[in-house]
Amino acid sequence: MDLVALLKSHFLCHLIFCYVFIVSGLIINTIQLCTLLLWPVNKQLFRKINCRLSYCVSSQLVMLLEWWSGTECVIYTDPRAYPKYGKENAIVVLNHKFEIDFLCGWSLAERFGVLGGSKVLAKKELAYVPIIGWMWYFTEMVFCTRKWEQDRKTVSESLLHLRDYPEKYFFLIHCEGTRFTEKKHQISMQVAQAKGLPSLKHHLLPRTKGFAVTVRSLRNVVSAVYDCTLNFRNNENPTLLGVLNGKKYHADLYVRRIPLEEVPEEEDKCAAWLHKLYQEKDAFQEEYSRTGTFPETPVVPPRRPWTLVNWLFWASMLLYPFFRFVINMVSSGSSLTLASFVLVFFVASMGVRWMIGVTEIDKGSAYGNMDSKQKHSD
């Protein structure tokens, strides 16, 4: 292991990242809370401010992926569609197989300048996760319980609120509903067989109702669906902890731009369209597993410096008083003070580890693991 790799995996570096992320995140959450006063007076100003505050948080994680770990992402896409990316609102349909697929989605949004305003259809429990979840609440993310009887009205209402959103955004949706595992895949294919649908090898059966209501609610506001199929070279199994340790991954992302006019309006036809889309995604993944490449022209969108600039800003603001505080505590020589200091940072480290654990496959939700007879209907 070289010196740089050793440094990146050192606990002190992780402590610095965690400290900057937690403290800056809580400061930003506090500012976001104060901006609620603007909502009844000027809703659009509230949204623009929170869009930029959101960027200050989410871009720190993108910085870890792009600058700290140096992960490379090659996009395969139609050169005629490429100039439109970032200049229009889009629904991004991404496969859900890797622990950092959400981070790759954020990186895609960042490369095209729409990270701050981008949205996601997320499970409601994430709204209670400090910093990220609270940030999402203030930026009008769409939360769901994944029980359609409860979500039918609330999800539609949340989506309709985005029709006059003042910033460009990608609306990221994992139509599979949960991250891919072999157990979930086996159960999902039992459902596919029962419904007379073709089996998928690399994906779970997509949940069509959430996608249909998203398309219906955002039609004439969103210009296209971006069908995104993600994979990693050499059978890499990326993790958020690996990114924090500075491990470099090599991502390939196939992006197809599909005008929203081509997506049927009727729910049944929209469901059939989505099933066909996932059969095509499965074929692309199968081709990638055989050849190591996707169709279309490969392109690497340039990294923007703003994620790094943002992190350096917060680090310069927060690290000086932090180290002054540490030096003063050590100089005091008080055992009780030092013990309290160690305890606080142990708890903070465990909190960050818990947030990382939310992304881990082996600790993912049980959604999709129930018996096929007990699964909610599409």
UniProtKB/Swiss-Prot annotation:
Cellular location(s): Endoplasmic reticulum membrane
A single MF term (Gene Ontology): 1-acylglycerol-3-phosphate O-acyltransferase activity
GO biological process: CDP-diacylglycerol biosynthetic process
Pfam family, one: Acyltransferase
Keyword tags: Acyltransferase, Endoplasmic reticulum, Lipid biosynthesis, Lipid metabolism, Membrane, Phospholipid biosynthesis, Phospholipid metabolism, Transferase, Transmembrane, Transmembrane helix
Pathway, per record: Phospholipid metabolism; CDP-diacylglycerol biosynthesis; CDP-diacylglycerol from sn-glycerol 3-phosphate: step 2/3
Membrane topology value: Multi-pass membrane protein
Principal EC category: transferase
Placement of sequence motif HXXXXD motif: 96-101
Catalytic activity: a 1-acyl-sn-glycero-3-phosphate + an acyl-CoA = a 1,2-diacyl-sn-glycero-3-phosphate + CoA; (4Z,7Z,10Z,13Z,16Z,19Z)-docosahexaenoyl-CoA + 1-hexadecanoyl-sn-glycero-3-phosphate = 1-hexadecanoyl-2-(4Z,7Z,10Z,13Z,16Z,19Z-docosahexaenoyl)-sn-glycero-3-phosphate + CoA; 1-octadecanoyl-sn-glycero-3-phosphate + (9Z,12Z)-octadecadienoyl-CoA = 1-octadecanoyl-2-(9Z,12Z-octadecadienoyl)-sn-glycero-3-phosphate + CoA; 1-octadecanoyl-sn-glycero-3-phosphate + (4Z,7Z,10Z,13Z,16Z,19Z)-docosahexaenoyl-CoA = 1-octadecanoyl-2-(4Z,7Z,10Z,13Z,16Z,19Z-docosahexaenoyl)-sn-glycero-3-phosphate + CoA
InterPro entries in UniProt: Acyltransf_C, Plipid/glycerol_acylTrfase
Domain of life: Eukaryota
Membrane spanning residue stretches: 11-31, 125-145, 307-327, 338-358
Enzyme Commission designation: 2.3.1.51
Domain comment quoted from the record: The HXXXXD motif is essential for acyltransferase activity and may constitute the binding site for the phosphate moiety of the glycerol-3-phosphate.
Protein known as: 1-acyl-sn-glycerol-3-phosphate acyltransferase delta
Gene Ontology CC terms, in alphabetical order: endomembrane system; endoplasmic reticulum; endoplasmic reticulum membrane; mitochondrial outer membrane
Function: Converts 1-acyl-sn-glycerol-3-phosphate (lysophosphatidic acid or LPA) into 1,2-diacyl-sn-glycerol-3-phosphate (phosphatidic acid or PA) by incorporating an acyl moiety at the sn-2 position of the glycerol backbone. Exhibits high acyl-CoA specificity for polyunsaturated fatty acyl-CoA, especially docosahexaenoyl-CoA (22:6-CoA, DHA-CoA).
